[in-house]
């Protein structure tokens, strides 16, 4: 067997193979003999059919087995010989396999690019400055009040207003026929929330408890359910109850219910402290993203599409999980998997580029993760608790993938710290 390598690009190689005729014939005979022993052809005892008939009936099976055997014998040997480390499955292009004829085929694979990273010292990046925002504290307090609120039923004959919670029975019809998902009993709807199609909540405003109404509405043209989009519908609605939300007062008593706080001032201060920490964490992540982007701009590299596709798939799964937690789907957001991938492909490509460039900097600068780095991180994960540390260590010892991810994260942190150490950082206010 002979093999040659052609570089199609910095991330794609084509390996061409030629297998001698005698080796091809030998493999065909070996595969034929295995098939002959189990071949069941009408009119012949098993293993007794003539070769020409067996080859006619089992041609596809024979060719597949021969190709598989020759591939496994030559492909991995060539990878080792040429020191090729694929990140993708091979794309095979082959000639027809014939007795007494040399067999040629090619395997095209993607590989990591060889990166000579440069200009990574003194990267110029802008860092956002943290600015306290009292309105955020007030917003968080209001959210806490909302969480501690309760609903009080209004007396019979009350009139529904914007902001009230209406308890309704309803049935929706399209072309006079109830449609799937268009009915419910004792459904609690906050008027003005915009949860229903335009016009639905507005027509409940002004109704009295015990009142019924039939309303005509049109589904929006861009409605997530394409079977209903743009169609006219009738809803029969009965308003059975009206509730009003009552919020607790912002006082020391409220603060005490939120934890170990004696006064509302202490609670405000804690919220402000947590907000500052969250913002500083966000600012840090944003700065690191800017460093990676600056590194990419200084080092234009090609990356394997296989790695980009994998990153996209991870991003897709994460997005679907986040939506599922909110009981939403891509379709409800006017998207699908293909449109998501098209929208975020450049983001995924830059993430792959950034990861490879950070690895290249680490290699060039001799930055590595020591056992002491791992011990320190494990103790941090354990919250500084020596007893908990044992359980944390046990988890990472038994989960190889988790440990590899931890080491990769630590390596990235060390490289980022190195790059930030030489970066030229300018301050900027939040946009």
Curated annotation (Swiss-Prot):
Gene name for this UniProt entry: tig
Keyword Nuclease annotated: no
Domain of life assignment: Bacteria
UniProt name for this protein: Trigger factor
GO MF annotation: an example: protein folding chaperone
Domain remark text: Consists of 3 domains; the N-terminus binds the ribosome, the middle domain has PPIase activity, while the C-terminus has intrinsic chaperone activity on its own.
Family to which the UniProt record says this protein belongs: Belongs to the FKBP-type PPIase family. Tig subfamily.
InterPro entries tied to this protein: PPIase_dom_sf (IPR046357), PPIase_FKBP_dom (IPR001179), Trig_fac (IPR005215), Trigger_fac_C (IPR008880), Trigger_fac_C_sf (IPR037041), Trigger_fac_ribosome-bd_bac (IPR008881), Trigger_fac_ribosome-bd_sf (IPR036611), Trigger_fact/SurA_dom_sf (IPR027304)
Function (record text): Involved in protein export. Acts as a chaperone by maintaining the newly synthesized protein in an open conformation. Functions as a peptidyl-prolyl cis-trans isomerase.
Top-level class of the enzyme under EC nomenclature: isomerase
EC number(s) on file: 5.2.1.8
Catalytic activity: [protein]-peptidylproline (omega=180) = [protein]-peptidylproline (omega=0)
GO BP term (any one): 'de novo' cotranslational protein folding
GO CC, one annotated term: cytoplasm
Keyword vocabulary terms for this entry: Cell cycle, Cell division, Chaperone, Cytoplasm, Isomerase, Rotamase
Pfam families linked: FKBP_C, Trigger_C, Trigger_N
Entry annotated with the keyword Cell cycle: yes
Gene3D superfamilies for the chain: 3.10.50.40, Trigger factor ribosome-binding domain (3.30.70.1050), Trigger factor, C-terminal domain (1.10.3120.10)
Annotated PPIase FKBP-type domain residues: 163-248
Organism name: Geobacter sulfurreducens (strain ATCC 51573 / DSM 12127 / PCA)
Compartments where found: Cytoplasm
């Amino acid at each position: 067997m002979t093999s040659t390598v052609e570089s199609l690009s910095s991330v794609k190689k084509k390996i061409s193979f030629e297998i001698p005729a005698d080796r091809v014939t030998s493999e065909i005979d070996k595969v034929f003999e295995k098939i002959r022993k189990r071949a069941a052809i009408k009119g012949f005892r098993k293993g007794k059919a003539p070769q020409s008939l067996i080859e006619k009936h089992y041609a596809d099976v024979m060719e597949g087995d021969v190709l598989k055997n020759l591939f496994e014998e030559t492909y991995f040997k060539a990878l080792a010989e040429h020191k090729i480390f694929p990140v993708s499955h091979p794309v095979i292009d082959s000639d027809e396999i014939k007795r007494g004829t040399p067999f040629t085929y090619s395997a095209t694979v993607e590989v990591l690019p060889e990166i000579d990273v440069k200009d990574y010292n003194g990267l110029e990046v802008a860092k956002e400055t943290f600015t306290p925002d009292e309105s955020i504290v007030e917003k968080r307090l209001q959210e806490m009040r909302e969480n501690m609120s309760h609903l009080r039923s209004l007396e019979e004959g009350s009139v529904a207003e914007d902001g009230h919670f209406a308890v309704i029975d309803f049935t929706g019809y399209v072309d006079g026929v109830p449609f799937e998902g268009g009915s419910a009993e004792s459904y609690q709807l906050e008027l003005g929330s915009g949860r229903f199609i335009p016009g639905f909540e507005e027509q409940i405003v002004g109704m009295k408890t015990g009142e019924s109404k039939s309303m005509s509405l049109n589904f929006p043209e861009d409605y997530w359910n394409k079977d209903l989009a743009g169609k006219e519908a009738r809803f029969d609605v009965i308003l059975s109850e009206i509730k009003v939300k009552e919020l607790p007062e912002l006082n020391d008593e409220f603060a005490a219910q939120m934890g170990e706080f004696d006064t509302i001032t202490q609670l405000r201060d804690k919220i402000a402290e947590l907000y500052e920490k969250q913002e500083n964490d966000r600012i840090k992540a944003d700065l690191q993203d800017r460093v990676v982007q600056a590194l990419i701009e200084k080092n234009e590299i090609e990356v394997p599409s296989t790695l980009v596709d994998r990153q996209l798939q991870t991003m897709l799964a994460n997005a679907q999980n986040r939506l599922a937690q909110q009981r939403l789907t891509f379709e409800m957001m006017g998207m699908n998997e293909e449109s998501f991938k098209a929208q975020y492909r450049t983001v995924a490509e830059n993430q792959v580029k950034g990861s490879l460039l950070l690895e290249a900097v680490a290699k060039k600068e001799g930055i590595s993760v020591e056992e002491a780095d791992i011990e320190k991180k494990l103790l941090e994960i354990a919250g500084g608790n020596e007893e908990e540390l044992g359980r944390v260590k046990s988890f990472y010892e038994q989960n190889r993938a988790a440990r590899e991810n931890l080491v990769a994260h630590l390596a990235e942190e060390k490289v980022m710290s190195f790059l930030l150490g030489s970066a030229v950082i300018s301050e900027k206010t939040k946009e």
